[in-house]
Amino acid sequence: MQTRFILQWFTILSFFVIAFVLELAPWPVGFQMLKPAWLVLVLLYWVLAIPNKVSIGWSFLLGLTWDLILGSTLGVHALVLSTSMYIIAKNYLILRNLSLWFQSLLVVLFVFIIRLLIFLVEFSLHTAFFHWQAILGAFASGLLWPWVFLLMRKIRRKVKLH
């Protein structure tokens, strides 16, 4: 029983570590605008799949970690991720029962709103510029959502994480 518990938490943590690595991985300059929001995708999956284990607290801690890694103002990503994941966690039953293609469309919207909120918070704190390329990254996240969802669901079921 203890081994399964450790394996389950190791699985969740390893997905977040992989998401951080993918977020930090360098992309060619021409494709930088297509970079998906890996951390948001992984966090969104876990909030939809097991909202009783991964929810607002995890979102806040991951946001703080992301702020520390990026060197941005401490709490910006934590605030935006925790508030947006709160809304998603409140509506997880509705969102979970939507078709995968409709979830992809909502992921585009969620990622764009999260990036816009991060911009607005940073703009209120100091000078920040909004890049229209954030829209393309949101579309890339939406295109990747079905594959991310299916892969993570397969691994979650194999580990018997519910």
From Swiss-Prot:
Gene Ontology cellular component list: plasma membrane
Keyword vocabulary terms for this entry: Cell inner membrane, Cell membrane, Cell shape, Membrane, Transmembrane, Transmembrane helix
Gene Ontology terms: biological process: regulation of cell shape
Membrane-traversing stretches: 5-25, 30-50, 56-76, 105-125, 132-152
UniProt topology in membrane: Multi-pass membrane protein
Any one Pfam family match given in the protein's UniProt record, by short name: MreD
Keyword field contains Metal-binding: no
Localization, UniProt: Cell inner membrane
InterPro entries, sorted: Cell_shape_determining_MreD, MreD_proteobac
Stated family: Belongs to the MreD family.
PANTHER family in UniProt: ROD SHAPE-DETERMINING PROTEIN MRED
Role of this protein: Involved in formation of the rod shape of the cell. May also contribute to regulation of formation of penicillin-binding proteins.
Protein name, as recorded: Rod shape-determining protein MreD
